[in-house]
Amino acid sequence: MMTYYILIGAIALISWLVSSRLKSKFNHYSKVHLRNGMSGAEIAEKMLADHGIYDVKVVSTPGMLTDHYNPRNKTVNLSEGVYSQRNAAAAAVAAHECGHAVQHATAYEWLTMRSKLVPVVSVTSSLSMWVVFGGLLLGAGAGLGLGFYIAVAGLIMMGLATLFSFITLPVEYDASNRALAWLRNKNMVSQEEYKGSQDALKWAARTYLVAAIGSLATLVYWGLQVFGGRD
């Protein structure tokens, strides 16, 4: 169990460092003002229009770094700062979220797969740890029947969450690539602004990478606990 706490602690530390770096980057690039004077909302609306998407709304949502695309009601939700500000960070985030809208409109396969997993993972992710732990208490590690099968069921649930986190990676990287390509090809940003947008999105993507690695490490650890004691 101590190994688990050390592992989780290390992953939590790395996650905190990456998140802190991300916030620092966004604060820095928030000071790089766009030469075209467009706000994040205007950037988003133009990118959607340039891709022939007219059934998606751009709305403001409270908080910092709360930006997301909602495929259910087709809305690009931009945090208050991103929605109204006119800088490289806002342009990067707005274009990235619109990248998800473009994925949705073009039936991007990885986004489709992730969307199908959402309702399942939203339920199983909160239960998996308890199911595995319950199975271990019932003797899974010693190879006892009922406890073992309960623990395996928990591992499967945990595995779905891990799968979801890894499917998220190509979705996020592709959205960033679409955003950066559009910003560059449409001359929406200067070279300096483009570099800032690229750097900001790079650090945003790393938060998903750390989360995926953490999920896999947790799955492997508990898998060893369940299967390690069996002959």
Please give the residue ranges for each predicted region.
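Hydrophobic alpha-helical transmembrane segments of small proteolipidic membrane proteins, enriched
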Residues: 1-25, 153-155, 165-169
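Helix-coil boundary and interhelical linker segments in multi-pass alpha-helical membrane proteins
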Residues: 1-4, 137-152, 227-231
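Hydrophobic alpha-helical transmembrane segments of polytopic
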Residues: 7-11, 121-128, 150-157, 161, ...
